Design a protein with these regions (language model features):
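Bacterial N-terminal signal peptides that target proteins for export
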Residues: 1-10
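C-terminal motif of bacterial Sec signal peptides marking the signal peptidase cleavage site
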Residues: 17-20
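Mature soluble binding/inhibitory domains
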Residues: 2, 22-298
């Protein structure tokens, strides 16, 4: 009797356990997991800001407040020299006016950015593309240069350096100073351009003497020349003079080069000029490179 009562109690407990767990086919509730939550898509990034508008006029020398006729010098591939070049600033319009041998006089009109554009004549005709060098990039205040070429071609046909000429009587007449300059230029045909070029000019103002050197390498798509080192020889400079000139001699190439220039800035703080050097390219062909230089006192 006791055994039968114990057996019934165990069976009853097992039945209760199975019912509570939903086993044995009972009516328990099955667990159904919730579906995963899909995160909201991230908002698209904002569009890039529009490029700054191209200015209508150049601001080459921001300190200018009145119309100015600059000193100008350079070379064109056709052989024209700086005597045929003129650059001036028109304060009434804010325009820089270029008069070059290969183009009608016209204003520089920025088209791609503040420094790259074209010369537009009085009739609105564009005949010459031009890029002006930002003077601040060369640590200059009163001087810079420009490359220009016909609008139907990309090869530079000319280089012009321009700036505010040092007045007579403002060049020091005592002491000495060294200037460092940057070169721009290439072969007249445009297949070679200056890859790297500098000049060092050392003036003894009291003695009226000039010494220095010019270094240049030329490079093209399939050609090149140099590097060349030229020493100044037969220099011409006198005490108080605003201009200077000389020849260029190198042991690396036959023939002589030449240069001439002038001081710029109120007290000869800067200078500019033009140069011409002989070269022999990688294929053994001789030629003559032309260009300009601009620099400042060290």
């Amino acid at each position: 009797m006791a055994y039968q009562q114990l057996r019934n109690a165990v069976l009853a407990g097992a039945a209760l356990t199975l019912g509570a767990c939903g086993g044995g086919g009972g009516g328990g509730t099955n667990f159904i997991p919730s579906p995963p939550v899909t995160p909201a898509p991230e908002p698209p990034p904002p569009p890039p800001p529009p490029p700054p508008p191209v200015p209508s006029t150049a601001n080459v020398f921001p300190g200018l407040t009145q119309s100015t006729q600059f000193a100008a010098t350079g070379y064109e591939s056709g052989g024209s020299s700086g005597n045929d070049m003129s650059v001036r600033y028109d304060a009434s319009t804010g325009d820089y006016i270029f008069d070059l041998p290969s183009a009608e006089p016209g204003r520089f009109s920025p088209q791609y950015n503040a420094w790259s554009g074209a010369i537009v004549d009085s009739s609105g005709t564009v005949s010459t593309g031009m890029t002006i060098q930002d003077p601040t990039a060369l640590e200059l205040t009163y001087t810079t240069f420009a490359r220009y070429s016909p609008t139907n071609g990309y090869i530079p046909s000319g280089y012009v350096a321009f700036g505010s000429a040092t007045p007579e009587g403002a060049v020091p007449v005592t002491g000495s100073a060294s200037y460092t300059a940057t070169l721009a230029g290439g072969s007249p045909g445009g297949d070679l351009v200056v890859l790297d070029g500098t000049a060092a000019l050392n003036f003894d103002f009291g003695a009226g003497t000039l010494s220095g050197s010019l270094d240049a390498s030329l490079s093209g798509e399939w050609n090149g020349a140099g590097p060349y080192h030229f020493d100044f020889v037969n220099t011409v400079f006198s005490t108080g003079s605003t201009s200077f000139s000389g020849q260029l001699s190198s042991t690396g190439v036959q023939g002589m080069g030449s240069f001439d220039g002038r001081f710029t800035g109120p007290n000869a703080q800067e200078l500019m000029g033009r140069w011409q050097i002989p070269y022999v390219d990688w294929w053994g062909n001789g030629g003559s490179a032309i260009g300009v230089f601009v620099g400042h006192k060290q």
